């Protein structure tokens, strides 16, 4: 008998993967957590029925969240990741030699625990001496921070459950306060096919707070529609004006200095969402 998992991305559309075995399943304090081994994408983390990451395609998302803002900032030393308990963004952050400290604030400690167990290639960096892991509410952590971080990355789930507060204008205002005077932040902002209104709303809210606000995309096969967006807000540095000498060699599978600029070239229907 074959076992298949289907994520219903809308009421009428979804993505299906063949499952070899279930590694762990649990109702945590915050969400339903499943870790499964798939035939095509390796081990897969699923939260509340939604694919969060897989061993096969995780590098796309994690590289694009981390490297776009980190190469935009001239000297990122203190970095905060809100969410991201699988550790993938932290792994990419630590590839930048200027980074002296990376703080991870994840509300669900079980995500960290089982990512370390079943996704070691992704979560291994959480044990690095430069990393401080805090299990707690990222919204509250931001509210309690001021003029502290060079770069803040919001690696959240969809705007449901514990992540709802991470898609509000008040949260973005708090991020601005938590950043230094030339700070940068980035957040994943879903896809333009099924949630166009989210992209429009977030971009508008961020633009009212940050003088430089841009949208960029990446192709992620296991995420809804495969086309994913990220919104970047910056107080001073424009991601489209990064000098050539700022790019240094790091090991990546998706991100390149050429792709850095290309990611901001939007299909017309996507660009129309933020006009």
Curated annotation (Swiss-Prot):
Q: Which residues form the PABS domain?
A: 2-235
Question: Which Gene Ontology terms of cellular component type are present?
Answer: cytosol
* EC number, UniProt record: 2.5.1.16
Q: Which GO terms describe its molecular function?
A: spermidine synthase activity
User: Which InterPro entries does its entry note?
Assistant: PABS, PABS_CS, SAM-dependent_MTases_sf, Spermi_synthase, Spermidine_synt_N, Spermidine_synt_N_sf
Under HAMAP family, the record lists: Spermidine_synth
Q: What is this protein called?
A: Polyamine aminopropyltransferase
In its UniProt entry, the species of origin is given as Bacillus mycoides (strain KBAB4)
- Which gene does this sequence derive from? speE
């Amino acid at each position: 008998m074959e076992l298949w998992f289907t994520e219903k991305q809308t009421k009428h559309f979804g993505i299906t993967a063949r499952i070899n075995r279930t590694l762990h399943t649990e109702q945590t304090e915050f969400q339903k957590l499943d870790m499964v081994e798939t035939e095509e994408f390796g081990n897969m983390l699923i939260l509340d029925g939604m694919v969060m990451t897989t061993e096969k395609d995780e590098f796309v998302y994690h590289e694009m969240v981390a490297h776009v803002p980190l190469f935009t900032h001239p000297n990122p030393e203190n970095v905060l990741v809100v969410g991201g308990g699988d550790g993938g963004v932290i792994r990419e952050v630590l590839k930048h030699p200027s980074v002296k400290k990376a703080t991870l604030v994840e509300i669900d400690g079980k995500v960290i625990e089982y990512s370390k167990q079943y996704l070691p290639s992704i979560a291994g960096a959480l044990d690095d001496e430069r990393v401080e892991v805090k299990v707690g509410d990222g919204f509250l952590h931001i509210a309690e921070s001021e003029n502290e971080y060079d770069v803040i990355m919001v690696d959240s789930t969809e705007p449901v459950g514990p992540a709802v507060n991470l898609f509000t204008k008040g949260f973005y205002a708090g991020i601005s306060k938590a950043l230094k005077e030339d700070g940068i932040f980035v957040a994943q902002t879903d896809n333009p096919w099924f949630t166009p209104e989210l992209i429009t709303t977030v971009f508008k809210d961020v633009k009212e707070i940050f003088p430089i606000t841009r949208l960029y995309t990446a192709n992620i096969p296991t995420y809804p529609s495969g086309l994913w967006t990220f919104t970047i807000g910056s107080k001073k540095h424009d991601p489209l004006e990064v000098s050539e000498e700022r790019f240094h060699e790091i090991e990546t599978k998706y991100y390149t200095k050429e792709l850095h600029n290309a990611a901001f070239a939007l299909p017309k229907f996507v660009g129309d969402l933020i006009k």
